[in-house]
């Protein structure tokens, strides 16, 4: 079957009409949610300008948090974090209440762990791991093999292929071994493909050859046989040349007996070009047919370049988050939904683009945005649908 499609589908034909439709859709969803039977909580919208929608408790009990709903659904809802953020009590109160999963934004990347060959500093990564253990949060490890954020001692060396293999094996064995039994899933190889779905001629491809991917998974599995091992890729959530390349790559790995358990769909998205939910669902399904899991690993949705008012864009952003949450919840193999940051205040995007943005579930003032309530409603509906 040919899975390559054009992601620029009819949803973008008239942007202004689209945002009006999004606004109407979210209002309808919230009204329908409030009318559903067998619920012990209800959603009550307040004006979008404040970016808050309150949850009113019933007389018998307080409403569940997003984390409590996720625990009930046996679904990982996580976020990227950093030890520096964990010193803020406002941050940790929100983190503990709303998320059951954690991933290091940068602390487990090679350049942060080992600035000299053979010498590792795990102190910051350990802070994150210890915090997760105390608060009963599952941890995803990110990332073992990437061509960015490598230490200078490695990138500036001129070594033989065998020497590079020794270094890569030592790194994977050291890092995975340190946290064996404590990390549920590793992004073993990060972003190996180009936009056309071919292997990029990156640092590791040039140092070792295309087999660096297979070797990395084998070494990671040897270091922790219980950890789930993922290939993590960007812009490959829908049906396009890149996702076709991912499918071909992981299919070949499975045929060779390589221990791979899933595909990470990063999903750093732009509001003006969201993925088509049906395409994402089809992509997840074909991976399920291979026996592979899917994790949404780095989700954020940029607003800055989309047309329309801020209020309209916040509502439209919520629809994108909701579409993806519902798609993941409906897929038999999609087990995790991670955003790349907790609040807009800590997002990486403004630092990269130089523009203010609001890509996450919580606003800079710590209040939940329409995107949060959209994910909440999707999770709540999945739980209600499963009730007899």
Predicted regions and their residues:
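Boundary/entry segment of secreted carbohydrate-active catalytic domains
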Residues: 57-101, 105
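Bacterial N-terminal signal peptides
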Residues: 21-33
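Substrate-binding cleft and catalytic face of glycoside hydrolase catalytic domains
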Residues: 97, 101-115, 124-236, 303
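Acidic-and-aromatic substrate-binding clefts and catalytic sites of carbohydrate-active enzymes
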Residues: 79-92, 110-123, 193-198, 236-245, ...
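Glycoside hydrolase catalytic-domain groove-lining segments
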Residues: 128-138, 206-231, 239-307, 322-335
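Short, acidic/polar
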Residues: 83-98, 166-175, 241-253, 320-325
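Ser/Thr-rich, Proline-interspersed low-complexity disordered segments
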Residues: 30, 35-64, 69, 385-388
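Substrate-binding cleft of secreted/luminal carbohydrate-active enzymes
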Residues: 315-352, 363
């Amino acid at each position: 079957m040919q899975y390559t499609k054009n992601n620029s589908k009819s949803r973008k034909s008239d942007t202004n009409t689209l945002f009006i439709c999004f606004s109407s859709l979210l209002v309808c969803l919230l009204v329908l949610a409030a009318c559903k039977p067998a619920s012990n909580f209800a959603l009550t919208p307040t004006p979008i300008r404040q970016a808050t929608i309150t949850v009113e408790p019933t007389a018998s009990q307080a409403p569940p948090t997003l984390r409590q709903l996720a625990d009930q659904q046996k679904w990982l809802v996580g976020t990227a974090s950093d030890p520096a953020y964990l010193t803020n009590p406002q941050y940790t109160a929100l983190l503990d209440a709303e998320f059951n999963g954690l991933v290091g934004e940068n602390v487990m990347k090679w350049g942060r762990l080992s600035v000299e060959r053979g010498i590792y500093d795990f102190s910051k990564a350990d802070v994150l791991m210890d915090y997760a253990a105390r608060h009963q949060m599952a941890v995803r490890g990110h990332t073992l093999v990437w061509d960015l954020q490598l230490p200078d001692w490695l990138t500036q060396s001129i070594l033989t292929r065998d020497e590079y293999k020794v270094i890569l094996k030592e790194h994977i064995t050291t890092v995975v071994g340190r946290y064996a039994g404590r990390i549920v899933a590793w992004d073993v190889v990060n972003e190996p493909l180009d936009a056309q779905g071919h292997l990029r001629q990156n640092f590791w491809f040039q140092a070792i050859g295309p087999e660096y991917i297979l070797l990395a998974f084998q070494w990671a599995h040897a270091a922790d046989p219980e950890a789930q091992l993922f290939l993590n890729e960007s812009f490959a959530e829908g049906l396009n040349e890149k996702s076709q390349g991912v499918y071909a790559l992981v299919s070949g790995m499975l045929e060779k007996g390589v221990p791979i358990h899933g595909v990470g769909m990063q999903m750093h998205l732009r509001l003006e070009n969201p993925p088509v939910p049906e395409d994402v669902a089809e992509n997840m399904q074909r991976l399920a047919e291979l026996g592979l899991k899917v994790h949404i690993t780095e989700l954020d949705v940029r607003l800055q370049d989309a047309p329309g008012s801020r209020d309209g864009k916040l509502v439209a952003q919520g629809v994108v988050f909701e579409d993806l949450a519902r798609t993941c919840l409906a897929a038999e193999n999609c087990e995790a939904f991670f955003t790349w940051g907790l609040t807009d205040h800590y997002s990486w995007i403004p630092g990269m683009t130089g523009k203010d943005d609001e890509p996450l579930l919580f606003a800079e003032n710590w209040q939940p945005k329409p995107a949060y309530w959209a994910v909440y409603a999707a999770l709540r509906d999945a739980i209600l649908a499963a009730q007899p």
